[in-house]
Amino acid sequence: HLTEKKLLRLRDSHVNRLSVGVQSFDDGLLKRMDRYEKYGSGETIARRLKELRGVFDTLNADMIFNFPSQDLDMLKRDLDILTDIEAEQVTFYPLMISDMTRRKVVDALGNVNGGNEKRFYREIVRRLVPAYRFSSAWCFSRKGTMIDEYIVDYDEYAGLGSGSIGYLNGICYANTFHIPAYIDQVNRGRLPLMATRTFSLRDRVRYDFLMRLF
């Protein structure tokens, strides 16, 4: 997917930040997530990311840790590769499972062990800081002014674009990830929504508290 033609089109369209969903450079994990055949081996992805340095103002590598079958050595190898790539920004989220995706994740990856999460996170911080600075709990940037697309500085925010999430007037909404459907709805003068939820006062307080923890 990271072809030269597509990347140049993005750059020429004034896109200045590219976030690449890597998850892990471990081939075993990539195969279990059904990403190896789609996007290539960890070595291929790492090489492509290294070639992307300088094409955009910000190159973000989006990673996940605490996979059920992941051990500390596997995580350290991911960190070794990231250190070599020298991306401007790295996001490292723990594997998060919702009730809707739990069965699928367990079937593909196994049962999640929360006992490793703290130890793995400490290793990530130890390796990335001080070369990187905290932008949020999960986001590490070489420059303090860089953004994390999942973190906002305002009580309310509008999500524009395919797959974006917004929160306005106590309503949280998500736009469709399907780009053709998004374009079709916009052309029809309709909101390209995939899901909405109206928060109660209690929900609003809890949501605001959670957002401020970041």
PLM segments and residue spans:
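C-terminal scaffold of the Radical SAM
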Residues: 1-214
